[in-house]
Amino acid sequence: MQLQQEKKKLLYSLCDVCNIQLHSAAQAQVHYNGKSHLKRVKQLNNGEVPKASASLAPTSLQSLSSSSSQGSSCHSNTLPTLVRTPSLMMQSGLDMKPFMTFPVESSSPVGLFPNFNTMDPVQKAVINHTFGVSIPPKKKQVISCNICQLRFNSDSQAEAHYKGSKHAKKLKAQESPKNKQKSAVAQDSGTKTITSTSTNTTTTTTTTSSCTAVTASCSDQTEKSTEPLAAHKVPASPQAFVPAPVAPAVALVPSPCKTAPVHASPPTEPTGLAVALKNTSKPAALPTAPSEPSVESEEEKAKKLLYCSLCKVAVNSLSQLEAHNTGSKHKTMLEARNGAGPIKAYPRPGSKLKVQATQLNKGSGLQNKTFHCEICDVHVNSEIQLKQHISSRRHKDRVAGKPTKPKYSPYNKQQRSSSSLAAKLALQNDLVKPISPAFLPSPFSTTTVPSISLHPRPNTSIFQTASLPHSFLRAAPGPIRPTTGSILFAPY
């Protein structure tokens, strides 16, 4: 039994032709009847026999031919001779992999294909992939925005992001604390300069009071001339520490005093005092400097914020802001605010002046106002309506000087008026017809015709069967008055 099992294993364990390991009889039968096995058998018949099976060449060829003729190689008698190879051959076959790698030289395909450089990039990629020419992958340039924490795939995406409003808002949010710190530092420096100037003013007041005391003593007692000298020398020591404002007080001192040593002692001081004056004139102008940036013009604010407060338009760049400022809409809004152009602004009745004053500083200056366009002769109640009117086709055409287009109507006004007049005349002619004289006697016909013809009366020919006799139509005594005929309602 063991021998039979070993024979069965040898029968369907390995196919030397295809170098494939088989695990069952059914699998071996399917493989030997398959196209790939038969194709390789044909190749072996046409070509040379491998070296490993050279000793078994005649038997193998016979077995292959018989297997191909019979159809199934499992039932052939010559199959064991093909399969029963030496033990070394069996071990090598079992160790081999099902797919054998064919080494190809890694030479560039340019030498193999003469037209390689003129090929399409797709063909080049296929050839490079098949022939194993490895192209070093290019590193992608990572474009990122550190402020918004975003990565981009191309330069165009990055440019669009940098020009966008989200990036601008985040930039402003990061720059605003820096600007606040700078403004705080500037305010601290301004307070320091103010305190220094206040100390200087206090020292000048003390020196002036001392100088007045000295002049009084000089006028009263000339014997005590040494005392003013001492009093004058006392403030000379703080002059080294106190800045320039002491100079005018010192200049005032010597004039009332008659003592010559006072004039002779400070000839070296005025040069130092003049230098101190120049130095003090500069810090005096510093406190005004911080007040200037606080009052910024509208243009500077618009450039910083990229926003036009007059037209209420947000912009992504300075170039767009300049283009907006040079546009006709912005100019007309400016003219409306200033009242220089054809659009005049008037205060709205009921609006408070205080509210207007606060809004003039904050907004566009066009709130709580009504407007009148002199070109189009249109009154507008708000700023939004003014913008709509300025951007309308009617206003643009009037400004450009184009003639007004007539509104579409199926008929003209002249035709309508003429047709209505003709209809009225026809009705009057039909209604106002003179009564024939046959109804009236001869003496009254001439007198009654014009009076009766003025009033329309219905045609009674429909209701009368025969003509009325003349006795009914005789005039009554007194003034003649036309009577309306009776209306008879008859059934159908």
From Swiss-Prot:
Source species, domain of life: Eukaryota
Keyword terms: Apoptosis, Metal-binding, Nucleus, Repeat, Zinc, Zinc-finger
UniProt zinc finger (Matrin-type) residues: 8-44, 143-173, 303-337, 371-401
Spans annotated as Disordered: 159-206, 388-420
A GO CC term assigned to this protein in UniProt: nucleus
Biased composition (Low complexity): 189-206
Physiological role: May play a role in p53/TP53-mediated apoptosis.
Single GO molecular function: nucleic acid binding
Name of this protein: Zinc finger protein 385B
Major location category of this protein: nucleus
Alphabetized Pfam families for the sequence: zf-met
GO biological process, one term: intrinsic apoptotic signaling pathway by p53 class mediator
Organism, as annotated: Danio rerio
Compartments it resides in: Nucleus
Organism taxonomic ancestry: Eukaryota, Metazoa, Chordata, Craniata, Vertebrata
